Amino acid sequence: MALFPGFFRKGWYMPAGLSAAALFYNPELLLHSVKPQYMLAVSAGSVGFLALALMLFDFRRLAGAVASMKREAQLALGGFFCIAAGHFFLNGRYPFDALGESLVWILLPLAAYVYYDAFRFFLPRALALLGLWDLAVSGIQYHSGAMIFGIAGNTNWNAVLLLVSLPFLAWHLSGLLRRFRFPALASLPAVGAVLGYGLWIFAACASRGAAVALGLTGLIFLAMHLTSRGQRYLRYALLAVLLLGTLYMIGPGSGFARRIAEQEDRLVFYRATLGLIAENPVFGVGGVSFENEFVRFKPEDYFTRMQNAPRTNHPHNDVLFMMASFGILGWLAWAWLVLYPLYGIFRGGAGRLSGERKLLLFAFLCLLFHAQLDLIFVAWPMNLIALWLLGLFWRDAFREEQVSAGLRHPAICRMIACTAGIVILFWTALSVARSAYASSTANAIHDPAMRVSEKLERISRSLRFAPHEYKPNYALMIAAGKLGAPELALAAADALIGSYIENYAHVYGYRGGALVKLGRYDEAFEAYLKEAENYPLSMIPVYNLASISKLTGHPERIPKIEEELFRRMKIQNVTPAQIPLILKNPDYDRAPWDIPVKYGGSGGYPKKR
C-alpha cells in the first residue's frame, strides 16, 4: 500500500478492477486476438454489479457523492432504478444477471461519478492502450485479407472504437515522446504515422454509421470554436444543405427515397419498434426483454430483405431501444441524464475545456451519434467506454457543494451496505462462473477427438449448471441434435424457452424436430405452429405441420396448411421442386435467393424484388 498510496485512498482500484474484469468479457480475446472464438464470461451486467458491490463496500464515499448530487439527478437515477428493478421483480423469468444488464446504464456512470479523480486519470490512458491493441489486431486482419473485426467483433463497431481511441493513442504517444525529450521534428512524423495508419484502417472498415458520427461530431466542435456570427452562418449553411438535400431526395426521377426504403433495414426496425412502444408506452417491456417481445412485431417484408436475421436484439437506435425497454418514463430519465451534462458543456463553450477533456467529449459524441444507427451502447467495449465517459460529465453537471462532511453514517447502515455488497459479489461470481462454463462447453464439444458420450455428458452438466445461458445453450441444443440425442436437444430447447428470451432464434423449430424424433407428434405440432408464427415467411415449419398432420391422421388440417405454404412460396419465389433442397439446407429458408441457378434459383439477391 505504501508503494501505491492512491490505489485505495483515491479509489484507483475501481477503474482498474472494472477494466480488468471487462477484459474477460471474452477470454479468447486475450489468447487469440486475431481470430477469437466466442466465449462469453463477464457481461456488462456483471461489471455493473461489481461496481455496485465495490461502491457499497466504500459506503461513506458513495453516500457522500450521491448526497452532493442535484435533486433532479437523484430523481432521474431513482426513477430509472425503480423501473428497471420493477421489471426484475415482476418478471419471474429474469435471472440475477438480467437485473445487472438493466441497471448497468446507471451503475457504471455512477461509479465514474463517485470515483471521478480515479476515472479521470485512468480512462484516457486505458483508451490509448485499447487503441493500440485494436489497431494492432485490425492491422493484422487487414493485411491478411480478413474482415476487419478488431477486438470489437464487428467492422462497424470496430470503426467507431478506432475513432474514439486513436486520438488518445496519438495524444499520449506525443506526451511520451516529449517526456523523453524527442525533438519535435522526430516526434511529429511518428505520431502522424500512427494516426494516419489508424485512419487508413478506419476508412477500410467502410462504416457509414461511424462516418456520420464523425461528421456530426466535427460540426459540433466547429460550432463550439466559432464566434456567435460564425455559428449563425454555420446554421444558415446547414439549413441550406438540408433544404437542397430534401429537394433532391423527393425530386422527380431521383429515386433516392425509394432506394433507401428498399435497402435500409433500419427503417423496418424503427417502424416495428414504434409498434412495440405503442403497446407498452409507460414502463416498457424490460431492460433485457426487447428481443423476446420484438419477434411479434417483425413485419413480413423484413424477411424478404437480404440482411434479415433470425434474431433482433436491438432496433439499431438507442432512443427507440430505451423507450421500448424502459418506457417513455424511463427514457425521459435517461435522456435527462445524458443531455443535461452535454448542454452544460456546450453552454460553457470550448474555451473552458482542456485538450484531454475535448478528446473525452469527442469520444462520447461519436459513440452517442453512432448509437442512433447501431448497437454501440450495448456492444463491448463501446458500451463500457460510453457509460464511463458519461459519468465523468455528470461530475460537472450534477455535483453541488460537498455535503458529505456533514453527513453521519450509522454503523448499521455501513453493515447493511457491506452485507449487500457481499451478496451481490457472490451472485455475480456465480453468474460469471455459469457463463464461462457454458461457453467453454459449447466450444469444447466441437473437438473431434472427444468421444460422443463425453460430449453428451458435458452438455447435460452444462444445462443443469447454467440453464439461463441462452447463447451457449442454443449451440448445445444444435449439437445435441446432431449427435443423435433428441432428449438432450429437447432439454436444451426447454431451457431456452424457460428463459427470459422464450422466442430465441428458431428454438421452437428445433424443439419440434426433437419431439418428432421422440414420437411426441402433438407437442411437435404445437412447436412448429409457434415457429411458423414467429417467422411468417419460413417454409420449413409449415411443411412440417403438413407432414405431422398426414402422419397423425388429421387430413382436415392439410388444405389450410398447404394454402399457407404456397402463399409463402409465392412471396419468396420458391417452386415445389426446391422444397427438398430447402429442407436439406435450412439456410435457403431464410435466404431462398441464394438457391443456385442449377436448382432453379436466382443465385443471389435480386436488385429488384
What is each residue range found by the language model?
Residues 148, 214-218, 236, 244-281, ...:
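Flexible juxtamembrane loops connecting transmembrane helices in multi-pass membrane enzymes
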Residues 471-475, 505-510, 539-544, 574-580:
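Alpha-solenoid helical repeat scaffolds
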Residues 276, 287-324:
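Interfacial juxtamembrane loops and adjacent helix segments
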Residues 234-251, 408-434:
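Internal/C-terminal transmembrane anchor helices
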Residues 4, 8-24, 42-55, 77-89, ...:
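Alpha-helical transmembrane segments of multi-pass inner-membrane proteins
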